Amino acid sequence: MAKTNQAITICSLLLLLLLSETTSHLLCSDSKTPVNNNETLQFCDSYKERSCCNSKDDLQLQNRFNSMNISDSNCSSLLKSILCSKCDEFSGQLFGDDDSSLVPILCNSTSQDLCSKLWDSCQNISIVSSPFSPTLLGGATSPSTSSNSSTLTDLWKSQTEFCTAFGGPSQTNNNKTKCFNGEPVNRDTSDDDEDDVKTPKGICLEKIGTGSYLNMVAHPDGSNRAFFSNQPGKIWLGTIPDQDSGKPMEIDESTPFVDITDQVSFDTQFGMMGMAFHPKFAENGRFFASFNCDKVKSPGCSGRCACNSDVNCDPSKLPKDDGTTPCRYQTVVSEYTANGTSSSPSTAKIGKASEVRRIFTMGLPYSSSHGGQILFGPDGYLYLMTGDGGGVSDTHNFAQNKKSLLGKILRLDVDVMPSVSEISKLGLWGNYSIPKNNPFQGNENEQPEIWALGLRNPWRCSFDSERPDYFLCADVGKDTYEEVDIITMGGNYGWRTYEGPYVFSPLSPFGENVSSDSNLTFPILGYNHSEVNKHEGSASIIGGYFYRSNTDPCSYGTYLYADLYANAMWAAIESPEDSGNFTDSLIPFSCSKDSPMKCTAAPGGASSGPALGYIYSFGQDNNKDIHLLTSSGVYRIVRPSRCNLACSKENTTASAGKQNPAGSAPPQPLPSSARKLCFSVFLLLSLLMMFLTLLD
């Protein structure tokens, strides 16, 4: 028995270690965003404002509760609260990654916490189809019992064993883990401590390149190399210098990695808009380009028009846009390869410009607002950002129409390829399959590719490298407002019903200006056009990244973004941490006097900062250093002291960490999914060893 208790104690400690790594981002257990209740929940009536349940969910939970046939009132009340925790706005954290579970993490730090109360009240009470069966935890064994009705003591040997399986620590100032204690979880509004993120005094830059690029992607092999591309359709492979080395980046523009300019239609609105390298590029050599093509000049370019009968749109009735017929220009995602150009894809210095396969093709009704960024998410799927298609204020309200792929975030599986017959049967737009948990599958009135909707022209999205459930996208506004959104599964971001937080009144009579899904998600950040360009009122947001490099410790944890016109940059802070509540500040930026390449001062003198021209995009290398891709060159964020900026966290006696040579990955924290996998393996091995010890 002593050995058994020791084993249980060890398992409890391991569980605490796992739980300490979780976050409290407002997210439902099904990965959707909590919504404001438009109607009172009759059963789970404790959740009155924002929740993860609608009336249908509420009824299902009530029916499940009634079927348990619990005779004791105290036990019954606790079981009701546990079932209703599915409606909690923090249920994504309460249930971890298991949406199928009916039991959240139960608070278990003291005898007054829910797990102890539940055992005391319910241990000898019969529960039909008990949600506490060990078999529901996956692989655990339990004493012989009826599968229909059982008590806790039928299923578990002791309170300790039960609470080890279902319990977790209560939240404290040092422990931000969420557990369920019988009531709706409150947001953490405790005062910031000295380690919390603060707004930096400013941003210090150095110029390391003269090229004008639209996209930057770190080499998937984890080295100090990165890919850069321009709008006409060329991709280069460059080498990023060490911080404090005084060297510019190495890139030979006379020898591109790949040149697809003959496939790309390029002008001010069109071109190569995005590129993505497969997470296993170093092994399989697969990479992808998102661009526009002209079907008049390229016969192989043609695809289905986004203006079609399914969305009540007739392309023959659309007016010409700048003299161009509707759907002459297409949005294309094509796959290419670096295989066969060197001994391994990781060492390849050139790729092949011939298309391996066409992943996606869609005709554009107008010539503006077509997005085009692509990136691989931490889940391994390819995300494609599409604009609303242009026209006068989203003429046909495509962004709110779930039969249209315009104004959306699409999520595609490019590892499982369908047959030609499957593409036709499913009505796909190319060679890809649909991830199983995409939110709009199984309904003929909704496109299964859609991950999120209600966007006007998303321009630069990124996942937080430390918290993969934070997927932020900047969305370019029309007349008034630029915004940043946290993208979640099935989220609706309002356009054209709203422009940012403002109700939008379109000039076009086409399409109902009301979403069939009234649960809209509003921006976490944004700014009015007049804030950045008071004379003309012009603005165009450029989405950025959470700063996760050690180079500037005073910027660590902030979300950085900017405006196209290069005279405004913001640092946003989330407070409390993992709450989804952000505040931002305009921050000054300057160029280091010892920059490897000279920075030209903006009009108004050195105090006005460097003349960046236009900011096209941000980039992030494998050391998490942030780069600005501008019309005047490539700039990198460096140590604050190089611009005489005060930062108490900076160690000025030691230079920043060295970059990683080609082929060597930098040491980075494991993502949460990897930590959980490692924990599971470690736990199983530990249990096995303890079991073998008991046999001795």
Curated annotation (Swiss-Prot):
UniProt entry keywords in alphabetical sequence: Cell membrane, Glycoprotein, GPI-anchor, Lipoprotein, Membrane, Oxidoreductase, PQQ, Signal
Propiece span(s): 673-696
Keyword check for tRNA-binding: no
Residues with lipidation of kind GPI-anchor amidated serine: S672
Domain of life: Eukaryota
Cofactors: pyrroloquinoline quinone
Example GO molecular function: oxidoreductase activity
Primary location recorded for the protein, binned into one broad class: membrane
Sugar attachment sites: N38, N69, N74, N108, N124, N148, N175, N339, N431, N513, N519, N528, N581, N651
Record's GO cellular component terms: plasma membrane; plastid; side of membrane
A Pfam family recorded for this sequence: GSDH
Keyword Repressor: no
Protein location: Cell membrane
Record's bilayer topology term: Lipid-anchor; GPI-anchor
Secretion signal span: 1-24
Family, as annotated: Belongs to the PQQ oxidoreductase GdhB family.
PANTHER family xrefs: HEDGEHOG-INTERACTING PROTEIN (PTHR19328), HIPL2 PROTEIN (PTHR19328:SF61)
Protein name: HIPL2 protein
Provenance organism: Arabidopsis thaliana
Gene transcribed to yield this protein: HIPL2
